[in-house]
Amino acid sequence: MGLIKKSKNVTTAERDLVKRLTKKCIKEIVKVKWEILGPSSKRLTMADVWDKLYLKIKCKGQRSYGGKNYVCIDISDFRKGRTFFTEYARIKSDPIIGEMEFETSEDALLALIAHEVAHMIHYNYFIYTPWLRGGDNTPHGQSWQKIYRILRRELVNTNKARLAA
């Protein structure tokens, strides 16, 4: 298991929830059908990702982020009970990966975690995965969006409360 760190103001229950949702995202994206590869064209497994992961959970009203074997989640909106998940301008209008109202704050938290796990997977594995190599590999580019789209479609958007058009 990788390293999990929580800020002093984060409860054990909140830490465990973020850990569970992070694992859920990783388990989905390493499924055989998505063909995410690691070094030497080896199919990625849960252990490959989880054992290297540094997961940090904080509650400071700051940004969350994901990168090289690293995911940092700020749970402030979750703790406030917010169910609306905002996205960056580049993707906010996308019907699958855009901004969305969810039924519960836990669902909105899952959307946040999926966003950051997508960054971590993209950063570490796009170079090894043929279907990710060809696109725009910027942080919110086409390749990252492909990963994020899988996570949102398969895990997150199943509990959305669609916004009125």
Placement of each model-derived feature along the sequence:
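Active-site-proximal or metal-binding-adjacent scaffold patches in catalytic folds
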Residues: 1-111, 120-165
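Walker B catalytic acidic pair
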Residues: 116
